[in-house]
C-alpha cells in the first residue's frame, strides 16, 4: 500500500465504525481518480469503491494498478508490438557511425528550433546513437553520437493514407494537435497505433499497452513554446523507455488484495464483495452513480474524494497523446475546471459537483479533497465547503517525499463550533505561532490560518467569498513585510529568512513546546515501523499531518537522522533496542569517567536499577560523604532534576549536567522545560551527549529557532558527540581539561573559547590548590 492509500485508510477508520448492518453497505467514491489508491484503501477496510477516472490515461493507470499484468506477459506483448511496427520505426532514423561506418539507429536529433525538424533539408546540431561495433571495442558508443559531415535526416511528406489516418485520429481536437510531433515521429506513431488496433491481447494487456504508447507519445511531443532547443526523440526509443518504466512499476508493485475485484459495471455495487468499479468520469458517470444510490437505500457512501489542482495544460496534452491509443473523447469540462488555480473557478466547479452528488450525501460521508499547496486552491475549496454549509480541517501531505500538498476533510452536517468570535488577523496568527512554538514563515501558517478562518465564518453563519478569501490569504502570506523587527515587543515580529515569531509578554508565556519536537517523535516512530515491517506509510503520513508543517530541509534532516534509503527502500540506521543499549552504555561510561577525573557522580533514579555489563548504573555512582545531595537539587524542581541522565560534580566548585540522547531528540523539551526548572549559576555546565547521526539535526534546529539558540547559550550548553566518551575513557589519566578538546560538532576543529574550564576552577592539576579555593577531599 502506498502512502496515499495509507492516508485514505486512516481517513476511513471513523467512517467504517458508523452503525450499519454490514461493511458491505459502505461505498467509497473518488470523482477525480488519478490512481487506485482509494480502491486499495477501501479493500483494506473491506469496503467497496467507485472510481471515476479523470481521463483515458488515468483509467488505464488505475486498471494496471488493480489488475496488473505479469511482467513476462507484458514484455512479450510489448515485444510483439515493436516487431509489428519495426519497419516504420526504422524509417527516418537510420544513419551510420562516424568512426567505423557501421549502420546505426538514431535515438534522437537535436534541433535549435523545434519547427526545423520538419524542414526538408533541415540540419540538426547533434544526435544520440549507439554503435554496437564501437561499443564492443570499448568506445562506449561515443563515436556513434558524432554526426556525419552535413548530415541531414531523411524527411518527406506523409503518405496520403498515413495523413488520412492521422487527421482522423485528431478530428475534433484543438488546432495543430498533430503538429506536436514531427513528420518522422508521426509516421512511426501511426504504425504503432495501427498495430495496437489490430492487437488481439486481453483487455488488461491492451490497457497496459495503450498506456505505454500514450506515455511514450507524450514524452516525445514537441515543446509548446517556440524558440526552445528540442531533442526529437525517435518513437522506438521513447517506446522502449516507456516499456522499461512500466516494467519497473510492475516489478515493484505490491500484491493486490485477493478480495479486490475490478469491474466497469455499476450494478456490481449492488452485489456483495469488496470490488471496485472503474469508469470514465463525466456527467453520464455521475448521473448514473447518483441514480443508483437513490434507488438502492442499502448503499451508504462512507467517503467522497475529490482532487483539485494539477495542470490543465498537462491534462490537455495527455488527452491529445491518448488519441494514438484510440481514445477520441476530451476531458470533462467540470473536471478541467477543478485543475484551475483560480479560487472562484474552483469554488464554482466544486460547488456544482457537490450539488450533482447530493444523493451521495444522505448519510453524511467524509468529504476528502486533495489539493496542491496553493493559496488560490485552498480558498476555492474552503469556499465551496462553506457554500455547502460545512467547514473543513486542513492537513499537509507528502505522497512522494518531494511534492507538498494539502488535504481538506469535512463533514457537511457538522454543527458550527460554539463560542468562536471573529478575531483580527494578527491575533489569530499569534495564536497559531504560540501553538506551533517556534519561528515559522507566514506561508507555512497559511493552511492552519485558512481552516481557523473558515471555522470562525461557519460559527457566525458567514458564507465565504472565494475572491475575497483568496485576497486575504495572499495578505497573510505577505505578512512578514508588514511586521516590525525584534525589540518592538509587538504581538508578532519579523525575523530573518521571512519567518515570524511572537514577542508580546502574554504570547511568550503561552508558548508551547516547539512543534519540531513532535515531528521528531513521529520521525523516530518510523524506526519502529520499519523494524516491524509494516506501517511505514502510516508513520510518514503522521509525520506530515501537521497543518503548519515544517521546512523541507528540516523534514529531510529528521528522516536522515534515523533512516536511510537504499535502492529506493527506506531502512532504519539503527534499531530502537540498539539505540537504547547505546544510550545506557554511554551513561555508564560517563559514570565511570567522572571519578577518574576527580568528580562525584549521580544518575537519574529511573536509570539507577538498569544493568550495563553486569553492573547497575546506580552501583557506579559516588556520593560526597559530607553532602549526599547533589548540588543545586534543593533549589530546583525535584522531578526535573531527577530526570537528568547523569550529574558530575565537585562540591563547592561546579556541576556538569549530562543528557544522553541517541533518539529521539526532544531538544525543545530539554532546553525550554526540563532545564528551565533546574537552578543554575555561573559554574554550571550542561553537556548534550549526542549520537553522531543526530548532530546535523541539532545544528539545523538551533540555527532555525532563535528561542532554542538563546536557551542553548544562556544554559551554557555544549555538544559532546557520543563517540567521544569512549575516546576520553581511553586516556590513561583523563582530566576535565581534556574534555575541551572533544566538544563541538567536529572536534577538535572548534571555537577555542567554547568552554574555558580553567577559569571556573576545573582545570587544576591534581595535588594543586588554586588561590582562594578550599580543596575538599574526595571519598
What are these regions (language model features)?
Residues 1-34, 38-300, 307-339, 377-380, ...:
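Nucleic-acid modification enzymes, centered on SAM-dependent nucleic-acid methyltransferases
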Residues 87-99, 103, 195, 335-397:
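Conserved Class I SAM-dependent methyltransferase catalytic core
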Residues 411-425, 460-521, 553-576:
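Charged low-complexity interaction tracts in eukaryotic proteins
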Residues 418-458, 508-547:
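Positively charged, polyanion-binding regions of nucleic-acid-associated proteins
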Residues 576-579, 601-653, 664-666:
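Active-site metal-binding core of divalent-cation-utilizing nuclease and nuclease-like domains
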Residues 637-641, 655-675, 697-698:
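Active-site-adjacent loop/helix micro-motif of nuclease/hydrolase catalytic cores
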Residues 693-779:
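Domain-level recognition of nuclease-like catalytic cores that cleave nucleotide substrates
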Amino acid at each position: 500500500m502506498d502512502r496515499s492509500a495509507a492516508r485514505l485508510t486512516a481517513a476511513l477508520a471513523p467512517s467504517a465504525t458508523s452503525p450499519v448492518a454490514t461493511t458491505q453497505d459502505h461505498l467509497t467514491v473518488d470523482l477525480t481518480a488519478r490512481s487506485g489508491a482509494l480502491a486499495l484503501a477501501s479493500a483494506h477496510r473491506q469496503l467497496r469503491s467507485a472510481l471515476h477516472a479523470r481521463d483515458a490515461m488515468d483509467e488505464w493507470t488505475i486498471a494496471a494498478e488493480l489488475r496488473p499484468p505479469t511482467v513476462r506477459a507484458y514484455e512479450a506483448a510489448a515485444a510483439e508490438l515493436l516487431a509489428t511496427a519495426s519497419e516504420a520505426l526504422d524509417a527516418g532514423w537510420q544513419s551510420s557511425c562516424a568512426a567505423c561506418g557501421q549502420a546505426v539507429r538514431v535515438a534522437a536529433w537535436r534541433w535549435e528550433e523545434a519547427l526545423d525538424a520538419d524542414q526538408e533539408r533541415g540540419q540538426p546540431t547533434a544526435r544520440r546513437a549507439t554503435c554496437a561495433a564501437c561499443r564492443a571495442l570499448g568506445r562506449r558508443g561515443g563515436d556513434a553520437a558524432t554526426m556525419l559531415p552535413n548530415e541531414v535526416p531523411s524527411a518527406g511528406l506523409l503518405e496520403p493514407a498515413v495523413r488520412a489516418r492521422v487527421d482522423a485520429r485528431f478530428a475534433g481536437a484543438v488546432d495543430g494537435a498533430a503538429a506536436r510531433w514531427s513528420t518522422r515521429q508521426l509516421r512511426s506513431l501511426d504504425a504503432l497505433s495501427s498495430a495496437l488496433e489490430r492487437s488481439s491481447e486481453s483487455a488488461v494487456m491492451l490497457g497496459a499497452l495503450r498506456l505505454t504508447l500514450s506515455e511514450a507519445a507524450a514524452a516525445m511531443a514537441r515543446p509548446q513554446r517556440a524558440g526552445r532547443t528540442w531533442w526529437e526523440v525517435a518513437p522506438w526509443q521513447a517506446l522502449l523507455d516507456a516499456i522499461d518504466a512500466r516494467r519497473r512499476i510492475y516489478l515493484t508493485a505490491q500484491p493486490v488484495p485477493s478480495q479486490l475485484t475490478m469491474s466497469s459495471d455499476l450494478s456490481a455495487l449492488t452485489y456483495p464483495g469488496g470490488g471496485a468499479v472503474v469508469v470514465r468520469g463525466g456527467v453520464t458517470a455521475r448521473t448514473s452513480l447518483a441514480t443508483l444510490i437513490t434507488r438502492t437505500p442499502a448503499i451508504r457512501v462512507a467517503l467522497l474524494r475529490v482532487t483539485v489542482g494539477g495542470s490543465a495544460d498537462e491534462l490537455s496534452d495527455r488527452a491529445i497523446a491518448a488519441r494514438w491509443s484510440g481514445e477520441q473523447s476530451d476531458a470533462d469540462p467540470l473536471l478541467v475546471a477543478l485543475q484551475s488555480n483560480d479560487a472562484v473557478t474552483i469554488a464554482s466547479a466544486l460547488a456544482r459537483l457537490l450539488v450533482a452528488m447530493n444523493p451521495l450525501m444522505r448519510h453524511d460521508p467524509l468529504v476528502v479533497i486533495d489539493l496542491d499547496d496553493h493559496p488560490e486552491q485552498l480558498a476555492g475549496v474552503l469556499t465551496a465547503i462553506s457554500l455547502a454549509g460545512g467547514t473543513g480541517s486542513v492537513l499537509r501531505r507528502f505522497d512522494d517525499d518531494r511534492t507538498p500538498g494539502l488535504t481538506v476533510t469535512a463533514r457537511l452536517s457538522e454543527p458550527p463550533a460554539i463560542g468562536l468570535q471573529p478575531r483580527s488577523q494578527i491575533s489569530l496568527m499569534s495564536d497559531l505561532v504560540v501553538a506551533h512554538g517556534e519561528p515559522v514563515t507566514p506561508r507555512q501558517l497559511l493552511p492552519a490560518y485558512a481552516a481557523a478562518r473558515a471555522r470562525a465564518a461557519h460559527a457566525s453563519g458567514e458564507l465565504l467569498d472565494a475572491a475575497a478569501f483568496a485576497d486575504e490569504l495572499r495578505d497573510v502570506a505577505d505578512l512578514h513585510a508588514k511586521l516590525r523587527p525584534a525589540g518592538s515587543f509587538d504581538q508578532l515580529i519579523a525575523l530573518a529568512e521571512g519567518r515570524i515569531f511572537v514577542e508580546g509578554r502574554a504570547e511568550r508565556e503561552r508558548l508551547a513546546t516547539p512543534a519540531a519536537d513532535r515531528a521528531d517523535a513521529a520521525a523516530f516512530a518510523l524506526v519502529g515501523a520499519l523494524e516491524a515491517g509494516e506501517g511505514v506509510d502510516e508513520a510518514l503520513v503522521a509525520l506530515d499531518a501537521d497543518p503548519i508543517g515544517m521546512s523541507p530541509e528540516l523534514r529531510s534532516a529528521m528522516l536522515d537522522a534515523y533512516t536511510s534509503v537504499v535502492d529506493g527502500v527506506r531502512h532504519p540506521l539503527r534499531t530502537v533496542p540498539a539505540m537504547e543499549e547505546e544510550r545506557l552504555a554511554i551513561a555508564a561510561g560517563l559514570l565511570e569517567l567522572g571519578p577518574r577525573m576527580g568528580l562525584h557522580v549521580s544518575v537519574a533514579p529511573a536509570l539507577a536499577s538498569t544493568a550495563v555489563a553486569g553492573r547497575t548504573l546506580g552501583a557506579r555512582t559516588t556520593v560526597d560523604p559530607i553532602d549526599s545531595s547533589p548540588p543545586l537539587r534543593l533549589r530546583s524542581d525535584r522531578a526535573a532534576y531527577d530526570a537528568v541522565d547523569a550529574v558530575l560534580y565537585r562540591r563547592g566548585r561546579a556541576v556538569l549536567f549530562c543528557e544522553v540522547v541517541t533518539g529521539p531528540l526532544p531538544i525543545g523539551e530539554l532546553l525550554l522545560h526540563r532545564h528551565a526548572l533546574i537552578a543554575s549559576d555561573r559554574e554550571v555546565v550542561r553537556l548534550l551527549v549526542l549520537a553522531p547521526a543526530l548532530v546535523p539535526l541539532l545544528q539545523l534546529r538551533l540555527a532555525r529557532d532563535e528561542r532554542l539558540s538563546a536557551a542553548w547559550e544562556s544554559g551554557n550548553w555544549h555538544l559532546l558527540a557520543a563517540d567521544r566518551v569512549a575516546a576520553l575513557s581511553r586516556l590513561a589519566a583523563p582530566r576535565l581539561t581534556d574534555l575541551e578538546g572533544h566538544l563541538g560538532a567536529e572536534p577538535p576543529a572548534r571555537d577555542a573559547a567554547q568552554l574555558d574550564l580553567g577559569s571556573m576552577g576545573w582545570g587544576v592539576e591534581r595535588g594543586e590548590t588554586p588561590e582562594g579555593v578550599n580543596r575538599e577531599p574526595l571519598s
